[in-house]
A protein has these predicted regions:
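P-loop NTP-binding core
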Residues: 1-200
């Protein structure tokens, strides 16, 4: 099972769209695919047609993760997100045990798991990064985008160097690209200069 976090500390960059489209694309190739909505806003759940009645928070109440999974109309399974993830964020913050997500998924049989993370570096995001084999970073070509991506890459490197994860940065996905826009070209040029091996 390959666990992939879709993450960026900035909101509005296309994380949810990327996560949902990847889940749908992989499911369409007959790979057993799970999408985890780790954002309390629950947009990935809504986009997948999942009800926000059960989330990963329920695992802290003793429920097995397999009881919480729903099947979307797009052939992939969904572990929905909702406002109760705020309580999970607090629980993870106060729990010294890391990798709650990976432990919860251990007995499941999926080829790929995609995690749509919140647009901030909180305990939910950190646990997703620790639990994942790799991270895809959606990035909108706009001002200050390089600062945010550098911060996230540094965080992943710190977690890896401290032995908490083997997370590798799988790549940077440019989203909402408008080739007529000079700013898009400038940011793309900078990305190709600083992260040539990571760009999609």
């Amino acid at each position: 099972m390959k666990i992939i976090a879709i993450s960026n500390q900035k909101g509005g960059v296309g994380k949810t769209t990327t996560a949902v489209n990847l889940a749908q694309a992989f499911a369409a190739t007959n790979r057993r695919t799970l999408l985890i909505d780790l954002d309390p806003q629950g947009n990935a759940s809504t986009a997948s047609g999942a009800k926000k009645i059960k989330s990963l928070f329920d695992t802290t109440l003793g429920r097995h993760v397999s009881e919480l999974i729903q099947t979307s109309s797009n052939q992939y399974d969904v572990l929905a997100g909702g406002e109760d993830l705020v309580a999970l964020e607090v629980a993870l913050r106060n729990n010294p045990t890391k990798g709650h997500i990976a432990k919860s998924l251990k007995e499941l049989n999926y080829d790929f798991v995609f995690i749509d993370t919140p647009p901030s570096l909180n305990s939910l995001t950190l646990d997703a990064l620790i639990s994942s084999d790799g991270t895809l970073i959606p990035l909108q070509c706009e001002y200050y985008s390089l600062e945010g991506i550098t911060s996230l890459i540094n965080t992943i490197n710190e977690l890896t160097n401290s032995g908490l994860t083997n997370n590798k940065i799988f790549g940077i996905i440019r989203t909402m690209v408008d080739k007529r826009n000079n700013l898009t070209k400038d940011v793309s040029d900078d990305l190709e200069k600083y992260f040539p091996k990571l760009l999609f």
